[in-house]
Amino acid sequence: MSRILKRIAAGVVIAGVAALLLAAGGYAAGARVNTTKSIPVGLYWTSSAPVEKGAYVLFCPPQLGVFDDAKERGYIGAGFCQGGYGYMMKRVLAAKDDAVAVADDGVRVNGELLPLSAPIKADKAGRPLPRYQSNSYTLGNSEVLLMSDVSATSFDGRYFGPINRSQIKTVIRPVITW
């Protein structure tokens, strides 16, 4: 190998190691990147803010069949949560004492139809999607409904229903989104 190629290879290795260290340091400091359509794509920072309506959150899905199927079908990734699920990012759109109803036209919270919330009957491969069944359910103290308000095709609460607050790992705040 020529001297120039050795220098180029060394430079590439050094740049790669530096990029990995920078990414690991950013993650340890609280940086999170969203590449899904469930919330705006971009860079987020973890926060100690309370979980409340309107907040973006990072959560581990509970070990339920609906999430096993979602992982198997590729709706959610593999990761380090129980059940081998990856973290998910959504927005809290309903919390304690909110009445939630799911119908063909979408999800209603306290009677108001959420935008982009109509359940889809089948995925792109033609497989039937699950659907949370509720004509009206009032969320308890420890329950939240996590949804997308920017995508009509997000795998969210319209399919899996409310989750327990204990599944939420942190609130995340947008830094740069596009």
Curated annotation (Swiss-Prot):
GO MF, one example: serine-type endopeptidase activity
Principal location class: periplasm
A GO term from the CC aspect: periplasmic space
UniProt-listed InterPro entries: LexA/Signal_pep-like_sf, Peptidase_S26, Peptidase_S26C_TraF
Function: Required for donor-specific phage sensitivity. May be involved in pilus assembly.
GO biological process, alphabetically ordered: signal peptide processing
Name of one Pfam family that matches: Peptidase_S26
Protein name: Plasmid transfer protein TraF
Top-level taxon: Bacteria
Keywords tagged on the record: Conjugation, Periplasm, Plasmid, Signal
Family: Belongs to the peptidase S26C family.
Signal peptide per UniProt: 1-30
Subcellular compartments: Periplasm
